[in-house]
Amino acid sequence: MASKEINFSDSARNKLYEGVRQLADAVKVTMGPRGRNVLIQKSFGAPSITKDGVSVAKEIELADAISNMGAQLVKEVASKTADAAGDGTTTATVLAHGIFKEGLRNITAGANPIEVKRGMDKATAAIIDELKKLSKKVNDKKEIAQVATISANSDENIGSLIAEAMEKVGKDGVITVEEAKGINDELNVVEGMQFDRGYLSPYFVTNSDKMEAVLENPYILLTDKKITSMKDILPLLEGTMKSGRPLLIVAEDIEGEALTTLVVNKLRGVLNVAAVKAPGFGDRRKEMLKDIATLTGGSVISEEIGKTLESATIADLGQAARVVIDKDNSTIVDGKGSKDEVNARVAQIRTQIEATTSDYDREKLQERLAKLSGGVAVIKVGAASEVEMKEKKDRVDDALSATKAAVEEGIVIGGGAALIRAAAKVKLELSGDEKIGYEIIKRAISAPLKQIAQNAGFDAGVVANNVEQNGNENFGFNAANGEYVDMFAEGIIDPLKVARIALQNAVSVSSLLLTTEATISEIKEDKPAMPDMSGMGGMGGMGGMM
């Protein structure tokens, strides 16, 4: 077992602070409209260039074990803030550094860390209450575009694309980000339900130019059974042939004689049919089939509920205005299911989302919700190089998450001004070391605004003082042009959720660091050098061995 080094009290906290400082110094240069880029060496390939705080934080590993522990804790704050709110990683890092720095000074001078923490927690809760009072709901496309633009580092084109996507598919709709073939950004909106299963045979294709199978006004057979024999589905095929309408088969799988017969009859023009595998796996597949059944007004043919393919009738089939299938995806447009049943299914999924404790399950449930309640929008990001593409795609992902956060909880004025406004309204009657904790938060809360001003080349102290002294709630500093403006009027806004989570996470990690009394870390041992092999030249005589 490796030897361990133990550090106590001020010695431990000072080394932790050094790690926090180094990480914050690297991350904070990216903050604001005039933030700078950070160039990151990769173990292979070209270096990456980014202005994304969490991307910078994730790359940092320090040589000193204790300093690295401090850096890793703050890195975790940046990641958690990004996961929960999609943005605010740099704000959280700058706040954590500011709070830890102020707190360390007071604790070194003799303040009780536990009492200080209690005061910090009370101040944070009060500031968040005031932030909520200062917030307003996002009402229109213009405000959504403003939030997205700021989160995408002032890229107005990305902002307008996200706003347009959200307008078309709704706040519960699926918006995905993909790489474009060229250098231009574009938005594609898929109406209806799309799932990631393509045709089982290219012989089902009806449009050879686009390699798509398009079925107009089709019946839809849904089953969780594997179809291997033609006799299983013969009665249904005869029924759909008499109606003169095409048939889409969605099953666990279709193989052997069944698939061959379908393809041959399709090529002969006897049947207008297409077949795809059911989406998802296991229990999730069953639920997704039920979603499609609800949307199309059909039933899932399943032996679990006593239905077999041989006994199924036309009445069990779903219907839609159109189905488009390519090699990767199937899209059902304008399903003929009852609106009331669809709404009931949506409400059921919402309840499951609220009840689940698994992030993965929540994500999959939200995807199902979006497919039922809205369409699917795809933002295609274009760039001239692979390095630019990665950086731009990261920005679009951040902007998308931040925009969803804004729609969820509302917006506050941006540029770090909302935190200062909220803190100014808080008046707590505390005493002793609790009061010190409260004052630490009040002093550190201006750190984001100061950093934004500093990155733009302005005097941070003067800017922060001017904002603090002005009584107008919407008054703030526009770092892009150096003017003091009405932040809402100028569209300089942040999601409330981003500001709230950044502050909560920053205070949480700072409290942990300030109440740390000992650190235990491994002592790095110098590995012995490899032995010199030059003296083994005499082994050359072994070359004759084959």
Curated annotation (Swiss-Prot):
Q: What is its EC number?
A: 5.6.1.7
List the lineage, top down.
Answer: Bacteria, Pseudomonadati, Campylobacterota, Epsilonproteobacteria, Campylobacterales
Q: Does the keyword Chaperone apply?
A: yes
Tell me which family the UniProt entry assigns to this protein.
Belongs to the chaperonin (HSP60) family.
Its annotated compartments are: Cytoplasm
Q: Which HAMAP family match?
A: CH60 (MF_00600)
Instruction: Outline the subunit composition.
Output: Forms a cylinder of 14 subunits composed of two heptameric rings stacked back-to-back. Interacts with the co-chaperonin GroES.
**What's one Pfam family the UniProt record gives for this protein?**
Cpn60_TCP1
Protein name (record): Chaperonin GroEL
Its gene name is groEL
